[in-house]
Amino acid sequence: MSASPQFPVDVGHVREHYDRLSSLYRLFWGEHLHHGYFEADESPRRAQIQLMERLAERAAIPRGARVLDIGCGLGGSAFWLAEHFGCDVTGMTISPVQARMASKKSAALGLSDRVRFEVKDANRWQPEPDRFDVVWIMESSEHFPDKPGFFERCARTLKPGGTLAVCAWLRRDAPMREDDRPLIRAIAKAMMSASLDTLSDYRRWMLDAGLSVIAAEDITRNVAPTWTHCARIGANPVVRLFLPLTGAATREFVRAFPLMVQAYAQGAMAFGLFVAKKPATGEARRSG
């Protein structure tokens, strides 16, 4: 299988994107900045909850777990994990604006003692070994150019027996078709994705990091409707009125919404859910 194309991603541009647009994300999409899992005709916000529920169920999140949420956005997953599982959550984001907004909400909810947020670049993050029961990654790994190294760091910070829970944008798990290349390139550029990789790539990187892969599921069919809803938001008259006042990168981002619909429809893109475990002390790794 051919290697996934690599695309240059400027960390400063990623930070600026989330600093500038997080308030609009919350206004138009809510506090959960990720796909939804659609089973019928649910609302997008209900579907977003269902995606978290599915990942948490597959990962068997233990009550009271210490969780690291990498790419935490506005804290949607962090607050949900604290509410439903009593977790102690540390959220990591590249965006000072997101960290400030999420910290303000945590204080307002009286959760500052167990839901906190840090500004860190996950590309340069140096993890404390054996610290967390769960590392939760909801659609942020796409931004990172060195995914094998990133998953090694995730494995390092997990306690023995700890769990890695990941949802990720992917490309189809087959050699890339020539007519998919320009579409993938346009999406990666607009969405600041360093690469769009395959289900097999992610599984291999987790195994190489010393983890046992418990689940590697293609749930594309259930998440694809997300972008039909996003395309409607992009066509909203208020958004169309606002767009000319934004920078070129923001306009390119919004104009990519219909490209996402197309990419899912023609099978160029996919979506994966992964659960992997760090072997407990003295336990042999399972090959998955």
Regions found by a protein language model. Name each.
Residues 1-27:
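N-terminal auxiliary segments of SAM/dcSAM-dependent transferases
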Residues 31-32, 42-63:
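Conserved alpha-helix/loop element of class I SAM-dependent methyltransferases that forms part
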Residues 68, 77-124:
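Class I SAM-dependent methyltransferase SAM/SAH-binding core
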Residues 123-135:
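A short acidic, Gly/Pro-enriched loop at the edge of an enzyme's catalytic core
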Residues 148-163:
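A short glycine-rich, Lys/Arg-flanked "PGG" loop and its adjoining helix->strand segment in the class I
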Residues 170-193:
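Short, glycine-/aromatic-enriched active-site segment of Class I SAM-dependent methyltransferases
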Residues 194-210, 216:
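Short alpha-helix
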Residues 215-288:
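Conserved Class I S-adenosyl-L-methionine
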